[in-house]
Design a protein with these regions (language model features):
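Short beta->alpha transition motifs characteristic of CBS
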Residues: 122-125, 181, 272-278
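Extracellular/periplasmic juxtamembrane segments that couple receptor/chemosensory ectodomains to their
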Residues: 227-295
Length: 295
């Protein structure tokens, strides 16, 4: 009997050790998971500040360019002479010159006449004469306040960092010039840091939009930096309620969600930063999918 009691006691001790070991492992795992999440929150806090700083830098840069272009003699003369062909040639040359710098290789220029009608779009030379400025906050504010304006704005060409300056000649306003920068250079920069950037525009905040197959990648948002976005993680992104989460974890994937605010102080979408802490999986996913592969 004492022999069985001895084995029973040993069994009880082993069970207690197993329970305590499991409990310790659970508590340790929970602690490490919480510690990792806290570390990732600190990591994202830093990079959100860097993102905002980078956007501010691009705003400053685009405004400086718009001011210089507004003072460009060739731009002023073609507007004064109402010579659109000459303006087209000048805008093409200026776009090409600025685009030689890597951070401006996707720069767009938009020239307006004195009545704020579209005169030359560098990305669509055949489309002009439309009076779209009535719905454009920055263009209207620049004219109303008679000073350069800069901010983020969504319109037919998509979400851009936009800067608008009035073109003046002998004290008279003869037109306006707008500089548009997209988010691809920022997206590519973050890629080198092992971070994915998504610039998401709410579909119900887009006043006008040229349809494309990639519009269906996400049901509620347009991906505005499509060429630099990591489309391999779209499947996870689709399941995140961006209105609900500022920080989201799925397995080894960490997401930080930041409101995208336009020049009129209206939220029009989100910036999403993503990091995969699984280095092997992250390296494989660097071979980004083309948008067509999602359909």
């Amino acid at each position: 009997m004492s022999k069985y009691k001895k084995y029973f006691n040993i069994y009880i001790v082993l069970v207690v050790f197993a329970v305590l070991g499991s409990l310790f492992y659970f508590l340790y795992s929970s602690y490490m998971a919480e510690k990792k999440q806290n570390n990732m929150r600190v990591f994202f806090d830093y990079h959100v500040k860097q993102l905002n700083k980078s956007i501010d830098d691009e705003k400053f840069s685009s405004m400086a360019i718009s001011i210089l272009l507004a003072q460009n003699e060739s731009v002023q003369m073609c507007l004064l002479g109402q010579d659109r062909d000459e303006c087209v040639k000048n805008i093409e040359n200026l776009t090409k010159t600025l685009g030689a710098a890597s951070m401006y290789n996707n720069i767009k220029l938009h020239l307006y006449d004195k009545d704020l009608k579209s005169y030359v779009r560098s990305w669509d030379l055949n489309r002009y004469g439309d009076m779209i400025a009535s719905g454009r906050f920055l263009v209207q504010e620049s004219r109303r306040q008679n000073k350069p304006m800069v901010g983020i704005e969504a319109w037919y060409a998509g979400v851009h960092i936009r800067a608008v300056s009035n073109v003046m000649h002998e004290g008279k306003n003869i037109g306006s010039i707008e500089v548009l920068l997209n988010y691809d250079s920022l997206g590519n920069f973050y890629k080198t840091q092992g971070i994915d950037l998504f610039v998401l525009l709410s579909k119900d905040k887009m006043p006008a939009h040229k349809s494309a197959p990639s519009d269906q990648i996400l049901s509620e948002y347009y991906i505005e930096n499509l060429s630099s976005a990591n489309l391999n993680i779209v499947g996870i992104l689709r399941d995140i309620d961006l209105k609900k989460y500022e920080f989201y974890v799925y397995k080894t994937h960490y997401f930080c969600v930041v409101p995208l605010i336009d020049a009129s102080n209206t939220q029009i979408g989100y910036y999403v930063l993503h990091v995969n802490t699984d280095e092997k999986e992250r390296n494989i996913s660097q071979n980004y999918l083309e948008s067509e592969e999602l359909f």
